[in-house]
UniProtKB/Swiss-Prot annotation:
Cofactor note: Binds 1 heme b (iron(II)-protoporphyrin IX) group per dimer.
Protein name from the UniProt record: Catalase-peroxidase
Chain residue numbers at which the record places covalent cross-link Tryptophyl-tyrosyl-methioninium (Tyr-Met) (with W-102): 225-251
Keyword Heme included in the entry's annotation: yes
Cross-link (Tryptophyl-tyrosyl-methioninium (Trp-Tyr) (with M-251)): 102-225
Enzyme active site: 103 (proton acceptor)
EC number(s) given by UniProt: 1.11.1.21
UniProt key word Iron: yes
Task of the protein: Bifunctional enzyme with both catalase and broad-spectrum peroxidase activity.
SUPFAM superfamilies: Heme-dependent peroxidases (SSF48113)
A GO cellular component annotation in the UniProt record: cytosol
Length: 737
């Protein structure tokens, strides 16, 4: 018996000591039995039951009551309040907090917008136990007294970033600004794909000529960015530059921002590798209960201070590791470097002539002097043909370096927060930045209920069909990602590059629909005398709502789809084409669209899309069924349109999917497409994709489909569809929150 086998209870006391029962504390899960089972749990993360805050809690309201200056004073005092259980290097915790914040924010990747500092996920597994996050558990314990003091007025997620900002300010650096607004989560996020490897530092994520799997950003399991010793521990600076460029690009950083971030971060502090890594104990999630969530217990010497072991690399980068200056570039260019190994056996670089330049004090014994060191990834900033000139320019122009690092650091720590409108507090910089996806201010009074009725009638009189209007509104709104709060209908960027040319948006049809709606917009705006206007962003959504109402009426249901005006139209100058390119759907099961080589099934990609849209399983289900009934597939594909009355908002998709008179067979070896034939006659009735059939195959989704297929559920189906539709249309309306 391995301790996980089932033990049947007897008539005696069921709480047998030393015996593991099939409870929440043990036993096989469904995923253990069926590893390929569709994971719908990611649609129900962060449920209210997991949140300890009271009903109605508003973090934004709490931030308004926060004495920010008092908080910053307390953080500044903490920087030099060294604790015996984890002494501060050089008597200052600033560098440690910079690393904590960097590793909190640095998990962000552009491919799916997941990761980043929002939510404070560094507190939970797996991030709290990644090898690259070694000893950051101590950093979080050091700021706990401040979190305890200020309570709900500041989240862990905000505090971990602000601690680094204040730390840098106390070391002489002027930051660009800070936005509060990162709300804490209370459980690990299960939607983030960190990689398929089952060992720490595994790198099975590469194919071909070192092509990194999408959407991953880090080069190895358990690293934030790249291996500082070089690819797979090979100390090759030019090969390291390749990894750096790819990884930082997937964090939305260009070459200049990359150089600034690495050099700026390594201006502070030191690396820790005083002895053999064999002295280091297990990570926090594997540590014994008496350690109270702390990991990496070190048996080398005192285990702390001069005896600390974290990365295995050892030493400072600059002569003054707790002062903002140009010391990193002075050191990088001021020496010729030779390969060596740290006391822990890690590859790093040391000056060929250690007496040629200034040394740094020992981090815990000011009477001792130590030579600086560089990592393989640091030398890449000098030797790479693109990074090298940037580094040289920063070395010769410290003001440019300071500004570049301030801006890149602000971007790093705010990239997953969405538009500037979501930033809170008095430290938000005034400057508008292109990567924030800026929007213009609304002009004139908003349209009212009479205007809305008039515009609906005019749209429906244009001759545009229900599928055309629904598909356009969905295409506009469904770019939203709850991960990094980007995309959505506000801005009407569907009319701009690159969205207007995406294959999933049917460019030819889209151009016709937009031209027609622009005609309605122009006529309405031209007829106003009070400065009132309707934006195209609003009109696209309103047109979709009108189409849904018409489709519901055709099915016998009079409904009013909620609509709130207030969207604005962004310009092409406010839209970074490359930045928005990552939002292009390679798969959208709601439109039965699939054009990707990702190693995932169509149904897995549907669930992933639904999670990014913050949808629950019932919301995902009703939207797929409704959009099929509305005939809103890309390129008017008939797959999944299980109805003889397309364009009417019926529950026919569910009724016909669950009809046992239909037999389904695959029409391709990869089982991507299917045909449904009459069980008796063999006549072809329907065609479908995996996305369609999963609602009859997966037991949980079938249970939901059965609800919507019931004879008494037609009205409830329409109501549920309208509610889910409205939610998607308003996902980026942060002004309505």
């Amino acid at each position: 018996m391995d301790g996980s086998e089932l033990v049947e209870p007897t008539t005696k006391c069921p709480l047998k000591h030393g015996v593991r029962f099939h409870t929440s504390f043990g036993g096989r899960s469904n995923r253990d039995w069926w590893p390929n089972q569709l994971n719908l749990k990611i649609l129900h993360q962060h449920a209210p039951a997991s949140n300890p805050m009271p009903a109605g809690f508003s973090y934004a309201e709490q931030v308004e009551t926060l004495d920010v200056e008092a908080l910053k004073r307390d953080l500044a005092a903490l920087m030099t309040d060294s604790q015996d259980w984890w002494p501060a290097d050089y008597g200052h915790y600033g560098p440690l907090f910079v690393r904590m914040a960097w590793h909190s924010a640095g998990t962000y990747r552009t491919g799916d917008g997941r990761g980043g500092a929002g939510g404070g996920q560094q507190r939970f597994a797996p991030l709290n136990s990644w090898p690259d996050n070694g000893n950051l558990d101590k950093a979080r314990r050091l700021i706990w007294p401040i979190k305890q003091k200020y309570g709900a007025r500041i989240s862990w997620a905000d505090l971990m970033i602000l601690a680094a900002d204040v730390g840098m300010e106390t070391m002489g650096f002027k930051t660009f600004g800070f936005g509060f607004g990162r709300e804490d989560t209370w459980e690990p996020e299960e939607d983030v794909h960190w990689g398929a490897e089952d060992t720490w530092l595994g790198d099975a994520r590469y194919t071909g000529e070192r092509e990194l799997d999408k959407p991953l950003g880090a080069v190895q399991m358990g690293l934030i960015y790249v291996n500082p010793e070089g690819p797979n521990g090979k100390p090759d600076p030019l090969a390291a530059a390749h990894d750096i460029r790819e990884t930082f690009a997937r964090m939305a950083m260009n070459d200049e921002e990359t150089v600034a971030l690495i050099a700026g971060g390594h201006t502070f502090g030191k690396a820790h590798g005083a002895g053999d890594a064999a002295h280091v104990g297990v990570e926090p999630e594997a540590a014994g209960i008496a350690l109270q969530g702390l990991g990496w217990k070190n048996s080398f010497g005192s285990g702390v201070g001069s005896d600390a072991i974290t990365s295995g690399l050892e030493g400072p980068w600059t002569p003054n590791p707790i002062k903002w200056d140009n010391g990193f570039f002075d050191t990088l260019f001021g020496h010729e470097w030779e390969l060596t190994k740290s006391p822990a056996g890690a590859f790093q670089w040391t000056p060929k002539d250690p007496e040629a330049g200034p040394k740094a004090p020992d981090a815990h014994d000011p009477s001792r002097q130590v030579a600086p060191m560089m990592l393989t990834t640091d030398l890449a900033l000098r030797l790479d043909p693109n990074y090298g000139p940037i580094s040289k320019r920063f070395h010769e122009n410290p003001d440019q370096f300071q500004d570049a690092f301030a801006r890149a650091w602000f971007k790093l720590t705010h990239r997953d927060m969405g538009p500037k409108a979501r930033y809170l507090g008095p430290l938000v910089p005034q400057e508008e930045l292109l990567w924030q996806d800026p929007l213009p201010e609304p002009q004139g009074p908003p349209i009212d209920a009479n205007d809305i009725r008039e515009l609906k009638a005019k749209v429906l009189a244009t001759g545009l069909s229900v599928p055309q209007l629904v598909a356009t509104a969905w295409a506009s709104a469904s770019t939203f990602r709850g991960s990094d709060k980007r995309g959505g209908a506000n801005g009407a960027r569907i009319r701009l590059s690159p969205q207007k040319d995406w294959a999933v948006n049917q460019p030819a049809q889209l151009a016709n629909v937009l031209a027609t709606l622009e005609g309605v917009q122009s006529a309405f705006n031209g007829g106003q005398t009070d400065g009132k206007t309707v934006s195209l962003a609003d009109l696209i959504v309103l047109a979709g709502c009108a189409a849904v109402e018409q489709a519901a009426k055709a099915a016998g249901h009079d409904v009013e789809v909620p609509f709130t005006p207030g969207r604005v139209d962004a310009s092409q100058n406010q839209t970074d084409v490359a930045s928005f390119g990552v939002l292009e759907p390679k798969a959208d099961g709601f439109r039965n669209y699939l054009n990707t080589d990702l190693p995932l099934t169509a149904e897995e990609l549907l669930v992933d899309k639904a999670q990014l849209l913050t949808l629950s399983a019932p919301e995902m289900t009703v939207l797929v069924g409704g959009l099929r009934a509305l005939n809103a597939n890309t390129d008017q594909s008939s797959h999944g349109v299980f109805t003889t009355r397309p364009g009417s908002l019926t529950n026919d998709f569910f009724v016909n999917l669950l009809d046992m008179r239909t037999v389904w067979t695959a029409t391709s070896e990869d089982e991507a497409q299917f045909e449904g034939r009459d069980r008796t006659t063999g006549d072809l009735k329907w065609t479908a994709t995996r996305v369609d059939l999963i609602f009859g195959s997966n037991s949980q989704l079938r249970a939901l489909a059965e609800v919507f297929a019931q004879s008494d559920s037609q009205g409830a189906f329409v109501g549920a569809f309208v509610a889910a539709w409205t939610k998607v249309m308003n996902l980026d309306r942060f002004d309505l929150a």
